[in-house]
């Protein structure tokens, strides 16, 4: 691996910043100052230091984002901002991608990573990874709707797997409900379509959980952070 790529991967700085840091003599390779960005290193064996601190290579990174509305869950889009536009320059150099998708008007928990194996496992239909959503609904959800979800909602093109519908609150004056929906699938507009089947309309949708991951309440919309060590260990253990 080239030294400059290694330094960028270790979040020392952007490619341009790293070259300047090398020129300034702030990087050593195996105890010697190194100024060549093109130097080929063995990230497992060579000792690379920045300002005296040993750097450890991270092959994979994992970010939790509170996706806002109006942003596309994609790596690129010709018309809209994407979730990658919300990351800083260093995070974008990790070549992460969103694990699954949230509709442009849906907000909440989104995992971004460059770990393709983890992403595949979480999205595999065989694993039935639960995802929980909080939905503001126009109309009054009933116990009958709870039972319909539990049986599996028959949509036009497929029948949903049994899902859990919890009625959090009902406001008969405003004709609206707040519900929590847990599904093991992730089909296009699935929660909205399931609610529509019951004769109601989702007006706001937020994802709260994905498998063992739970949205951090302290993350404002559009903010992101690295997964904690504990959260990552639990997530990896859940798909092992």
Where are these regions (language model features)?
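Basic, flexible Lys/Arg- and Gly-enriched helix-loop patches that mediate nucleic-acid binding at interfaces
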Residues: 1-240
């Amino acid at each position: 691996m080239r030294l400059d790529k290694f330094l960028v991967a270790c979040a020392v700085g952007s490619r341009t910043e790293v070259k300047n840091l090398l020129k300034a003599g702030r990087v050593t390779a195996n105890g010697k100052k190194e100024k060549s960005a093109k130097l080929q290193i063995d990230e497992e064996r060579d000792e690379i230091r920045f300002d005296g601190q040993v750097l450890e290579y991270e092959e994979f990174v994992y970010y939790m984002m509170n996706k806002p509305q109006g942003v596309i869950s994609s790596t690129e889009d010709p018309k809209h901002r994407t979730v990658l536009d919300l990351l800083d320059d260093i995070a974008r150099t990790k070549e992460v991608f969103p694990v699954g998708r949230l509709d442009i008007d849906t907000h909440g928990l989104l995992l971004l990573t460059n770990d393709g194996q983890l992403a595949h496992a979480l999205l595999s239909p065989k694993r039935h990874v639960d995802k929980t959503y909080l939905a503001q609904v126009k109309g009054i959800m009933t116990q009958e709707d709870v039972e319909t979800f539990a049986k599996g909602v028959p949509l036009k093109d497929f029948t949903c797997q049994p899902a859990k519908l919890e009625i959090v609150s009902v406001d008969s004056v405003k004709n609206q409900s707040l519900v929590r929906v847990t599904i093991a699938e992730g089909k296009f507009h699935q929660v909205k379509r399931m609610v529509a089947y019951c004769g109601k309309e989702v007006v706001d949708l937020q994802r709260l959980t994905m498998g063992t991951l739970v949205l951090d309440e302290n993350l404002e919309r559009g903010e992101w952070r690295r997964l904690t060590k504990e959260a990552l260990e639990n997530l990896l253990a859940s798909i092992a």
